UniProtKB/Swiss-Prot annotation:
GO terms for molecular function: L-aspartate oxidase activity; nucleotide binding; steroid dehydrogenase activity, acting on the CH-CH group of donors. It is found in: Cytoplasm. This is L-aspartate oxidase. The gene is nadB. It catalyses: L-aspartate + O2 = iminosuccinate + H2O2. InterPro entries: FAD-dep_OxRdtase_2_FAD-bd (IPR003953), FAD/NAD-bd_sf (IPR036188), Fum_R/Succ_DH_flav-like_C_sf (IPR037099), Fum_Rdtase/Succ_DH_flav-like_C (IPR015939), NadB (IPR005288), Succ_DH/fumarate_Rdtase_cat_sf (IPR027477). Pathway: Cofactor biosynthesis; NAD(+) biosynthesis; iminoaspartate from L-aspartate (oxidase route): step 1/1. It is an enzyme of class 1 (oxidoreductase).
Length: 527
């Protein structure tokens, strides 16, 4: 590369336009900093936030609930790997964050005028889930934040290729857009890139969930943790061998009384957990997987026929089912577990700060300590609002202290971008076969062999970068899964079916000297 095709500068650059990214950008803007928001997509609303159905877990001051109860439910779901202080900090700030969201224009469903309606989801001991549009909470959150961010500098079709730094602090970003590669100089960068669901052949995630932020963090030298804990949502709409993004069937349906049964009508979770169909997601998904293995059936069923007014309460699910030829009012809904959420990510504090000065992460890409080994339902939008807003404030404060001139002079043109990448279809098939809900040493080693066949590719566009990111993140997930020789939360090892108390520590992955490889620091405390 002879040099950048273009240059730009800002105080804060945010990568991502979901709940965490927009919350961060708005907070940084309110702090008086210049903000640039990047989206690799052509449309900014195509995010995991937009597709979120269930709601936001929040303790209301006038409800029969408490922050301590929400914290306890979160810790129980997290299977011993949550950071209790982080959990309390984020949960306790939830009501303030949701109130601010409503103040920005979000319209939540109400049980009576002036009182938010509440539902219950798996792992929660109380009805504490606020929602919008029945089962379109994410779409309403996305709409409200985008409307509020209408005056911000949001740029579509921009793919962040590398976080630039001087070894001590962030200096900017290398970005590719239709007119070529360029540099945005900035002292603060916030990664809010979402998840990694497209490691697998079928997922509830949108097309952009390709692990970009994890790869950017690894290349920047910061710690990534808990990547072996990939949550498979118990109820993804079954559609035969169809891959790509598949519709989610929200957990709130079970909260309103729907039951999970097999083809013979037998309960899936009876005798498995005291909370039955409302057990934490890892428990319910594992119970479904076990039943499918025992019966040889391709799916189980969510029977929601007893829910009065189903179509009006769950319009999104109703539309998805009817598009697939299923009437959920009259027929049980065929479901299977599907890749849904990364409980791990870039290690940050509860303000989104990473090890690298000026680099922040928020939302699904981050590991704050809230989720541990298994995320509690509807804690994701909560975390995005709370930590996204905090990260924006922190990034703005750092930018004010660092000053623009240092970042501008430090951001230099890098060498050509070339990494190794596996064919995406081959990678997804290998991950679905060997690193899905259940893992075994033989399969994980076979997966390592498959990943070692990745070929060098010059990164010149979004597709190239996504394939490179998926390959590096697949290596990271595989390495972490091999290192954890127990079953805990979302991570199940066939030859190690028990939870080992001595392994109640996080596994940290870092980028190796070779940018196409990773190394593992096994079982270290990162809380």
């Amino acid at each position: 590369m002879a040099g950048p095709a273009w240059r730009d500068a800002a105080d804060v650059v945010v990568i991502g336009t979901g709940v965490a990214g927009l919350a961060a950008a708005l907070a940084a803007d309110r702090a008086g900093r210049s903000v640039v928001v990047l989206s690799k997509a052509a449309q900014t609303h195509v995010t995991a936030t937009h597709y979120a159905q269930g709601g936001i877990a929040v303790v209301l001051p006038d409800n029969d609930d408490s922050v301590d109860a929400h914290v306890a439910d979160t810790l129980a779901a997290g299977a011993g790997l949550c950071d209790p202080d982080a959990v309390y900090s984020i949960v306790a700030d939830g009501y303030r964050a949701v109130t601010d969201l409503v103040g920005a224009g979000a319209r939540l469903d109400e049980s009576v005028p002036g009182r938010w309606a509440l539902t219950r989801e798996g792992g929660h001991s109380r009805r504490r889930i606020v929602h919008a549009g029945g089962d379109a909470t994410g779409a309403e959150v996305q709409r409200a934040l985008q409307d509020a961010a209408g005056m911000l500098d949001i740029r579509t079709g921009h793919v962040a290729l590398r976080v630039l730094h001087d070894g001590t602090a962030v200096t900017g970003l290398l970005v590719v857009r239709p007119d070529g590669c360029g540099i945005i100089s900035a002292p603060s960068v916030i990664l809010a890139t979402g998840g990694l669901g497209h490691l697998y052949s079928a997922t509830t995630n949108p097309a952009g969930s390709t692990g970009d932020g994890i790869a950017l963090g690894l290349w920047a030298g910061v710690a990534v943790s808990d990547l072996e804990f990939i949550q498979f949502h118990p109820t993804m709409l079954f559609a035969g061998r169809a891959g790509g993004r598949r519709p989610l069937i929200t957990e709130a349906i079970r909260g309103e009384g729907a039951i999970l049964v097999d083809r013979q009508g037998n309960s899936i979770t009876a005798g498995v957990h005291p909370m039955g169909d409302l057990a934490p997601r890892d428990v319910v998904a594992a119970a479904i997987d076990a039943r499918l293995k025992a019966t040889g059936d391709p799916c189980v069923y969510l029977d929601a026929r007893g829910i009065e007014g189903f179509a009006s309460r769950f319009p999104t699910v109703t539309a998805s089912c009817r598009a697939a030829g299923i009437d959920p009012v009259r027929q049980p809904i065929p479901v299977v577990p599907g890749a849904h959420y990364s409980c791990g990510g870039i290690v940050t504090d509860v303000y989104g700060q990473t090890e690298l000065l000026g680099l922040y992460a928020a939302g699904e890409v981050a590991r704050t300590g809230l989720h541990g080994a298994n995320r509690l339902a509807s804690n994701s939008l909560l975390e995005g609002l709370v930590v996204g807003g905090r990260a924006g404030k922190a990034a703005a404060a750092h930018a004010a202290a660092a000053g623009r001139s240092r970042a501008t002079s430090s951001a230099t043109w890098p060498e050509p971008i070339s990494y190794t990448a596996l064919d995406r279809g081959d990678l997804q098939r290998a991950m679905s076969r060997d690193a899905s809900m259940y893992r075994a040493a033989a399969g994980l080693h076979r997966l390592c062999d498959s990943l070692s066949g990745a070929q060098v590719r010059d990164v010149a566009c979004r597709r190239d970068f996504e394939d490179v990111a998926l390959t590096l993140v697949a290596q990271s997930v595989t390495a972490a899964a091999l290192a954890r020789t127990e079953s805990r939360g979302c991570h199940h090892r066939a030859e190690y079916p028990c939870t080992v108390p001595e392994q109640a520590r996080s596994i940290v992955v870092r980028g190796a000297d070779d940018a196409n490889a990773v190394c593992v620091q096994a079982l270290v405390a990162v809380c």
